[in-house]
Each structure stands twice: as structure tokens, then as C-alpha cells.
Amino acid sequence: MISIIIPAFNAEKYISQSVKCCLHQTYTDLEILVVNDGSTDATRFIVERLQSLDSRIKLLNKVNGGLVSARKEALQHVSGDFVFFLDADDVIDENTIESLAQYTKDYDVIVADFLLENENGKVLPCQHKNKKVFGDDKIGLYSNFLSKSITASLCGRLIKTDMLKDFSTPIHITTGEDVITNLIMVKNHNPRIKVINIPFYHYIQYPHSMVNTKNRKTLMKRVEYAQWVLDFMRQECLLDNVLIRPHLQYLLLDEYYYFLRDGGKVEYCPSFCKLANFEFWNDKVLGEFPIWKRLVLKSYHYNEYLGMFVRNALNILRKLLK
């Protein structure tokens, strides 16, 4: 059996299509666990109605605690040998589970690719493509997740349930929680990972979704996440490992870019900006980024005010091109 987990908070607009795409899977030996994470809208009632039509649906109601908390709750109730995470506002193709399940005898994690779409179904530009290029040992897997050669999102993949029995991702982390979960999983289990470059998962961006909300609090959550990764690598005695270091620099510079792009200022967290601008700065790693990222990062590296000018100009250009 395979367990599909759908955390849901105030998802009344989307939860029905999310659950129905699971019910329509060509692979039928599954259960669908919807975690109602303290919703104040009609999410619970919509799922209860669907539950009355198909016994494979299980509804778990809990006090709001966030995504990590909802996943932890679901993992206490799963019956499947493998778990598949699906966000409440996303959908998957009807042959997704069947296509991934054929590899479960030989692998612990089977990763599919995804499509990035807007609410009207238009496919958006996305540079992502899974490619496991740094090996299967722990160092190789750490490198793959740090450099995003394999997407870190827990959604859109089958994960052996035993790999998540010690799910210890901190509940207070709300940015980068999937990277953290993968790093912990590699540390504890060194999983066998299969990458499939077929986009079964449809990641849908809505204008008012949580991932599109930027404020100082969410910016600092990004800093908190980057610091967690640094601390983790330090505890593993890998902070200065010659194989890990470039991929760690990649992650830190990438997070620094999004921190700046979304309105972050050096005064918000001088220590983080200093780490990115000096200790973890690497021109060779920077060359792997798209030109607009390089422009912003190099401008800030030279002068904060120049960086702000370039960032704002690129943000205006991005809006005009939408």
C-alpha cells in the first residue's frame, strides 16, 4: 500500500481537486490522509463529503501547527510501505503513483519531476531538472540536495515509510524544511534514490499563496534555515570538506539572492550577509547562476546601494514582462 499525505489549511478552493486526482490514480492500493491543520473555512466539510464517497480517504483534524507539524501527525497514522506528499493546492497526473511504484523494490526514494503552472494552467518557465550527478554515498547525496541537482521538495516523490519514522525536522522551521528533512534522512539512512525526469507533479502558483507572501518575518525565516544548514554541516564535520564546500556555497548564495530579491536589507541580519559576501563567496560557484542572479549578488558584493538599485530595476522589469 502507498499512503498519500495532503496537509491542508484553509484550502476550500483547492482541496477537492487535490483529493480527486488521488482517487483517479491508476494505482488503487492506496490511502489518502488529509490533515486538516486547524482550517477555519470549509476544508473539513469538503473532505468529509468526499470521505463518504470513498473509504480510502482518512481525515485527521488537528490544531493549527504548520506544514511540518501536519506531516508529523499524518506519519503517525500511515499504513503504507511508501509515502507520497501532495500539497493541498497541487495536482498529479493519474498515472503518477503507478509510474513511481514500479521502482519501489530497488529504491527507497523515487523522485519525479514537476511542472510549474499558474492558476489558469499555463506552464511557467522553470529551470529545474532533476539530475543526480554527485554520487550515491552520503557526501554525494548531501551535495545533490545542497546544490539543488535533486529538488529537495518532499512532494512529488515516493519515500519509504521507514525513512521517515524518525521525522525530526524542527516544527518552527517554515522555510527550507524539505531540504532539512532530506539532509536528516541522508544522515540517518543513506537512502537509495531513483530520479525520473518525467513531470508528473503540477505545482500550481496562486497569487496569494503562502510562498508568494514576503515580509521581514519570512525573510528572517530564510536566514534561520541557512543557519540551520551551516550548523548541521558543522556538526557533521563537513563545513570545510573540499567536496561539500562548493555546494554549501551554492545554497548560501542562492538563499542570499532570494533574501535580497524579496526586499531583504543588510541591516536585517549583518552576520548572514557577511557570510554570503565574504566567507562563502565563490566566483566560480556564482558562474552557475542565471545572469540576473549574478547581477544582483555581484552588485551587493561591490556596494549595498548599487545592489539595491539593480535589484529594484530587475524587479520592475520582471513585473513588466509578466
Question: Whereabouts are the PLM-identified features?
Answer:
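Short, well-formed alpha-helical segments that are part of the catalytic scaffolds
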Residues: 11-24
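A conserved acidic beta->alpha catalytic loop
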Residues: 36-46, 63
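Glycine-rich, basic loop-to-helix element that forms the pyrophosphate-binding segment
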Residues: 62-78
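Short aromatic/hydrophobic "clamp" motif used to bind/position activated sugar donors
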Residues: 83
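Flexible acidic/His/Gly-enriched loops in nucleotide-sugar-dependent glycosyltransferase catalytic domains
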Residues: 96-172
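Conserved nucleotide-sugar donor-binding catalytic segment
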Residues: 139-217, 222
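Catalytic core of nucleotide-sugar-dependent glycosyltransferases
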Residues: 200-206, 212-240, 254-281
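Membrane-interface aromatic/basic loop that binds lipid-linked glycans or pyrophosphate carriers
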Residues: 262-322
